[in-house]
Regions:
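N-terminal active-site segment of His-dependent metallophosphoesterases
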Residues: 1-69, 75
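Domain-start "cap" segments at the beginnings of catalytic or binding domains
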Residues: 1-22, 134, 243, 249-274
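Short loop/turn motifs at secondary-structure junctions
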Residues: 3, 42, 143, 206, ...
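Surface-exposed alpha-helical segments enriched in charged/polar residues
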Residues: 35-39, 71, 166, 200, ...
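His/Asp/Glu-rich metal-coordinating catalytic cores
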Residues: 45, 56-71, 76-249
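Accessory, non-catalytic peripheral segments of nucleic-acid enzymes
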Residues: 255-417
Length: 417
């Protein structure tokens, strides 16, 4: 029996929120998964199906994080087999990458197809001396085959890979192929995903376990296609995805993949506050605070965990939406929730009011109607819209007649009493 751990989309060095603590979360997740589901379970090997790193160019501290994790596996004599993803593939015009660096130093084995244009076979066996190869036959009875990041050329590459896998020498009974691409229908707003039928040549070529990466959501199809999802959430939406690492066992009865999710992850909490057209700025602030306070009271949000929190405020308001100081509100709510990152999504609409106006209406009537519509839409002025709109017309005439500013201010004070 063989046992292995399938990881993908680790994204060490994630820095989207400009938070050093959030960047460390991705390291802590990987380290914990390795301890719990690779070392403690004594797997035969670990596979990484792309995007170990968030960026092609990484900082020394991020490289050190990867080395610390892989040194744990080295000490346990567990090999790591990896491929490049779209985030960490070899930059155009160069011949090296940080994954190749780790491979050359024996931290992992980067399984890459050969350069056919240079006369190399698509798949050569792993050469431990030169730290190079496209596939490896392991003593546990599994053949692991690598691939590259193909992007839009994935369908064409699948045909080439399938033919090359068929032509490989006879080897272990089980073949695992690492492939960084997504399957159609698994996630919205993702173009270029592969159809199931387009992957079938790999199954027909003898691939028993297609280890996917790229989409950050867990899925499996047909009993042979497996995608664990990312270890950590890359955005608040992914906080609600089923994600993790596959602990896989291969025995005489077949393949058994168990998704593991119990490891170090920072909680992501999404909240909603609904407004109505009669709400003032103070009302909106109170509703926002209430949404956070209720989440704390019900245990949805635990301040001590320093979660990532998103509060979406939506609906209509009875004031100009830009009058609300959202920066101060975000700061206050972050302090209240003790969130590491607090994202305030202020997506309200101002109440609109418009009286029908005849096409032949005079300019004076149009102006009066515009003032009245604006005042009617404001919660503080709508009951006096008729009086105030007349006052604004008078104010315009007074300005045009040349009255000074002091007189105009005095007129406004009396109008608003």
């Amino acid at each position: 029996m063989a046992r292995f751990l399938h990881l993908a989309d680790i994204h060490l060095g994630f820095d989207r929120y400009n938070s050093p603590e959030r960047t460390k979360d991705f390291f802590f997740a990987l380290s914990d998964v390795i301890q719990k589901y690779a070392i403690a379970t004594k797997v035969d090997f670990v596979i990484i199906a792309g995007d170990l790193f968030e960026h092609r160019v990484i900082q020394p501290a991020i490289l050190n994080q990867a080395q610390l994790c892989f040194q744990q596996l080295q000490a346990a004599h567990i090999p790591v087999l990896a491929i490049e993803g779209n985030h960490d593939n070899t930059p155009y015009g160069t011949s090296t990458s940080w994954l190749k660096y780790l491979s050359q130093w024996g931290m992992l084995k980067l399984l890459e197809p050969g350069n056919i244009a240079a006369g190399e076979p698509l798949y050569a066996p792993w050469d431990e001396v030169n730290k190079k190869g496209g596939y490896i036959d392991l003593a546990c009875g599994v053949r692991v085959v690598g691939s590259a990041w193909y992007g839009a050329a994935a369908v064409r590459a699948i045909g080439q890979i399938a033919e090359a896998v068929k032509a490989l020498p006879t080897g272990p009974d089980t073949t695992v192929l690492l492939f960084h691409h997504g399957l159609e229908g698994q996630i919205a707003r993702y173009s270029g995903a592969l159809r199931y039928s387009e992957l079938m040549p790999l199954k027909e070529a003898g691939v028993d376990y297609l280890a996917l990466g790229h989409i950050h959501k867990n899925y499996c199809e047909g009993g042979w296609i497996f995608n664990p999802g990312s270890l950590e959430a890359n955005n608040v939406e992914e906080g609600g995805f089923t994600r993790g690492a596959y602990l896989v066992e291969v025995d005489a009865e077949g393949i058994h993949a168990d998704l593991k999710q119990d490891y170090c992850q920072r909680p992501v909490v999404r909240l909603l506050a609904k407004t109505q057209d009669s709400d003032s700025e103070a009302d909106v602030v109170a509703k926002a605070r209430q949404a956070v306070e209720v989440a704390i009271a019900t245990g949805q949000l635990v301040p001590e965990q320093q979660s990532i929190v998103e509060l979406r405020i939506e609906g209509q308001v009875g004031f100009a939406r830009l009058e609300l100081d959202t920066k101060q509100l975000q700061k206050d709510l972050q302090a209240l929730s003790q969130a590491l990152i607090f994202l305030l999504k202020y997506e309200v609409e101002e109440k609109e009011f418009a009286e029908p106006i005849a096409s032949e209406a005079s300019r004076d009537l149009i102006e009066r109607s515009a003032f009245k519509d604006m005042l009617t839409a404001h919660r503080d002025y709508k009951k006096r819209a008729d009086t105030l709109s007349e006052g604004l017309i008078d104010l315009k005439h007074k300005r045009l007649s040349g009255q000074d500013d002091e007189a105009l201010y005095h007129y406004l004070e009396e109008l608003l009493v």
